[in-house]
Regions:
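Sec-dependent bacterial lipoprotein signal peptides
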Residues: 1-19
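Structural motif
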Residues: 11-14, 79, 198
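Short glycine/proline- and aromatic-enriched beta-strand/turn motifs that initiate or cap beta-hairpins
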Residues: 19-83, 89-97
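Outer-membrane beta-barrel transmembrane domain signature
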Residues: 20, 30, 44-61, 131-242
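Transmembrane beta-strand segments that form the barrel wall of outer-membrane beta-barrel proteins
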Residues: 39-41, 78, 82-109, 115-130, ...
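Solvent-exposed loop/turn segments connecting transmembrane beta-strands
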Residues: 68-74, 90-103, 132-141, 153, ...
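Residues that act as N-cap/strand-start positions at coil-to-secondary-structure junctions
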Residues: 74-75, 86, 143, 190
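Juxtamembrane/interface motifs at transmembrane-helix termini
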Residues: 110-112, 226-227
């Protein structure tokens, strides 16, 4: 396994990424088998709705933090997972300018040609919010708890259905009324996720959709900018198992 090459790909994706926090789960139908490695490459999008949706026209006098904390967009994505023990794996994902580490455990419900299991994980993440049109920049940290029911049919077809919950903190200096001022905020996100994979032997194509409700508690220059709404996070990619 060429870990140097994988690291180069991940770092390159960070450099190319935009400010959208489009981080998919890409759970698959099970954890990565012991002493095996999964490598995935693809993309993801973040589509905010309602009060989270970006305005069509940027108001120079409005807080630019809202465009950074929960902005929409499309980003490249890559991940790697390694099976450290039976039913346990560790992973690392880069989606745009966000990096997520992950530890997962699998409770097998049924063995055989059709294999089913419950997969739960804990995934801390962090990243930076790059400057967009001189609106300011900052960073983000958070954690996610994914929980899915997965089915693997003959190693050809996989299906997973479950939920993702996360908490996030954003911070930085952003424009408001013509000057950069400190801003910070905390966000909570919860919603269902569904995905499927289809392939042969070691190569599979994956598609996934998360539909979540999130709420932000934001302070910018002493003003409260709380808001909430729904967000869609579709993801897609190719997975190679080594």
């Amino acid at each position: 396994m060429n870990w140097t090459g994988l690291a180069f790909v991940l770092v390159s994706l960070v450099a190319l990424g935009g400010c959208a926090t489009a981080v998919p789960a890409m759970s698959g139908g099970s954890t990565t088998p012991k002493n095996r490695t999964d490598i995935g490459l693809g993309g993801a999008a973040r589509v905010p709705l309602g009060d989270l949706k970006d305005p069509a026209v940027l108001d120079p006098g409005q807080s630019q933090n809202r465009y950074a904390a929960d902005a929409g967009g499309v980003v490249p994505m890559a991940y790697g997972r390694y099976g450290i023990a039976r039913n346990w794996d560790l992973g690392l994902m880069v989606a745009g300018a966000t990096v997520k580490a992950e530890a997962r455990y699998e409770k097998v419900l049924r063995e055989g040609t059709t294999r089913s299991s419950l997969v739960v994980g804990l995934a801390p993440y962090g990243g930076w919010i790059p400057d967009r049109d001189r609106s300011g920049s900052g960073g983000r940290v958070g954690f996610e708890v994914p929980f899915v029911y997965g089915v693997d049919i003959g190693g050809i077809y996989e299906l997973w259905l479950g939920a993702r919950g996360s908490g996030e903190y954003v911070f930085g200096d952003f424009q408001i009324s013509g000057s950069e001022q400190r801003a910070s905020g905390a966000g909570l996100r919860l919603g269902p996720v569904i995905g499927m994979a289809l392939g042969v032997r070691r190569i599979h194509a994956l598609v996934e959709l998360t539909a979540a409700y999130e709420y932000w508690f934001i302070d910018h220059a002493g003003g409260a900018l709380n808001r909430g709404g729904f967000v869609l996070i579709p993801g897609f990619g190719l997975r190679l198992r080594l």
